[in-house]
Amino acid sequence: MITLTVPDPAAVVAALSDPPVFSVSIIQTKPGKFDEFVALQHEQFLRVRGQVQGVRGSRMLQSPAKGVVVLISSFDTAQDAERFRRDPRFTEHLERVQPLIDRAEAMPVELAYEVGLI
């Protein structure tokens, strides 16, 4: 698990002033490829962390027994999310992980409710 530092209070206040735009990806890895996929995801996270304008944050949930990863990303705006999807750092990463994926679905989602911090 990777632990990050808390951003400065001004950044938190600015981020909370407008609701984020969310994207969720559900990824089923090919048999025997889960660990390799997760390792590449961690490398990508470290590569782009704090480098992409408009990205508020992300979470990766994993189910090793099922070979499934759920990625949740939040962006300042829908335009920021689209810009990220076209960013060469992202498209090149997709090319690297594509051979490890059995199936994947990505979708924009809206916050229905929120309780506590996750």
Feature roles, as predicted:
Residues 1-69, 76-88, 96, 100-118:
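Short S/T/G/P-rich N-terminal loop/turn motif that feeds into the first structured element of a domain
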